[in-house]
Curated annotation (Swiss-Prot):
Belongs to the HscB family. GO terms for cellular component: iron-sulfur cluster transfer complex. Keywords: Chaperone, Stress response. The lineage of its organism: Bacteria, Pseudomonadati, Pseudomonadota, Gammaproteobacteria, Pseudomonadales. GO terms for molecular function: ATPase activator activity; protein-folding chaperone binding. The gene is hscB. PANTHER family: IRON-SULFUR CLUSTER CO-CHAPERONE PROTEIN HSCB. One of its GO terms (biological process) is protein complex oligomerization. This is Co-chaperone protein HscB homolog. Disulfide bonds: none annotated.
């Protein structure tokens, strides 16, 4: 038996645009129904199945709540595996990556919290724009390469956003 579709586990149709509040609510309801405490007196097999179901729900939720992971999953569902370490043939984006990294380093060196906040706002706007672009093209077979390019960009910006959060924590201490 294969792994269940992440979307189907939450009674959702595969789509990039997902109501994250609704997803979170469904996740909490479903995970409560398979909580280990509910199976404490159940046979070992039922306990194991509940634990497996909880793990599947968690994996599905973690994937669907993250825009880059959800985008990658949608491409995979449609039969297009994206190589994990694909060479990025996107010189414009490579230049943008270098510029963003340099800017983040400068903000770190100067411990500029206001600058970090501004950088973070720009990053969120860039992420939102990529998400809009991906939503418009992911299910169009003729725009597959564009969708893959956008996923790579989304993954980079997501990683950069994590680094910004870590920098904020260090600067707040």
């Amino acid at each position: 038996m294969g792994k269940p579709c992440h979307f189907a586990q939450f009674d959702l149709q595969p789509a990039f645009l997902v109501d994250l509040d609704e997803l979170g609510q469904r996740y909490r309801e479903l995970v409560r129904s398979v909580h280990p405490d509910r199976f404490a007196d159940a046979p070992e097999r039922e306990q194991r199945l509940a634990l497996e179901r909880a793990a599947q729900l968690n994996e599905a939720y973690q994937t669907l709540k993250s825009a880059p992971r959800r985008a990658l999953y949608l491409l995979t569902l449609s039969g297009h595996e994206l190589p994990l370490e694909a060479t990025v043939q996107d010189p414009e984006f490579l230049l943008q990556q270098m510029q963003l990294r340099e800017e983040l380093e400068e903000l770190q060196d100067s411990a500029d919290l206001a600058g970090v906040a501004t950088f973070k706002r720009r990053l969120k706007a860039a992420q939102a724009e990529l998400e809009r672009e991906f939503a418009a093209c992911w299910d169009d077979a003729q725009r597959r390469e564009e969708a893959e390019r956008l996923v790579r960009r989304m993954q980079f910006l997501d990683k950069l956003a994590q680094e910004v959060r870590q920098l904020e924590e260090r600067l707040d201490d």
